[in-house]
Amino acid sequence: MNDPKQIEKLYKLIAAGEGFNPNSPLGSMMVETQALTKKFAVISFFGAVEKRELDMIKTFVEKGEIDINVKNLVPQGLILTRPTTALGIAIAQGNSEEVIKYLLANGADPKLAFDDFKKSANIDGINQLIKIAPDMIACRKKYMNLNN
């Protein structure tokens, strides 16, 4: 879209609050920018968890921009080599109890982390999770069969 008249027309439509079409060149660029912003937010959220930055974690969670149970699809390779949730990363790193308790209090699902630890045969992670989330003890027998 290099035609100045088309660009001017588009600007006028946008200024009037009309004409947003996600399939148009500008619309698709805006949609792509939103997707990249979301990806950056998720990567930053996991970075905050890895660095134990509780204030930054709170910022992401309180703004509601992040699903607290989203999986990190690009593992950093520091501790885990498989995708896992923020809670799984926090536990695997031996993160501060304050961070772990905050994640749990704000909806982090311990069963997801438990399943991730089971898949990677991370017994230390499983045991740590059971200490932190005692309700997981009831699930322990079912999930401890690591051959399934």
From Swiss-Prot:
Stretches forming ANK repeats: 82-115
**What PROSITE patterns has UniProt attached to this entry?**
ANK_REP_REGION, ANK_REPEAT
Report the leader peptide range.
Answer: none
Which SUPFAM superfamilies does this chain map to?
Answer: Ankyrin repeat
InterPro entries registered for this protein in UniProt? Ankyrin_rpt (IPR002110), Ankyrin_rpt-contain_sf (IPR036770)
**One Pfam family cited in the UniProt record for this chain:** Ank_3
Q: What name does this protein carry?
A: Putative ankyrin repeat protein RF_1158
* Record keywords: ANK repeat
The organism named in the record is Rickettsia felis (strain ATCC VR-1525 / URRWXCal2)
